[in-house]
Amino acid sequence: MLVFLHAVFVTVLILLLIGRLQLLERLLLNHSLNLKTVNNVLGVTDTGLKVNCLQLLKPDCLDFNILYRSLAETRLLKVVLRVIFLVLLGFCCHRLLVTLF
């Protein structure tokens, strides 16, 4: 019974982590879209001027590759956590059925 309770507890924690990761993914997408919009609105051919304008608006995240890599890592982590969640859910159901019958 104690193993079952631990599995349920870990399953709930994984669900909370998945929710937080979805929020992080939305924030990263929003940040990426904001930078693309600023980039398209400026439409300046001189990249130096464009980067300077972007630095004024968003100084902490200029590299799109880093942003996309973080987004990909967030999505991968979310998939891994969902797989772990499904395995633990199956284990909980199995333990519950064994306990009842």
UniProtKB/Swiss-Prot annotation:
It is found in: Host membrane. Keywords: Host membrane, Membrane, Signal, Transmembrane, Transmembrane helix. Residues 1-23 form the signal peptide. GO terms for cellular component: host cell membrane; membrane. Pfam families: Corona_7 (PF02398). The chain crosses the membrane at residues 81-101. The keyword Signal applies. It is a single-pass membrane protein. InterPro entries: Corona_7 (IPR003449). Belongs to the coronaviruses ns7/ns7a protein family. May function in the formation of membrane-bound replication complexes or in the assembly of the virus. This is Non-structural protein 7a. The lineage of its organism: Viruses, Riboviria, Orthornavirae, Pisuviricota, Pisoniviricetes.
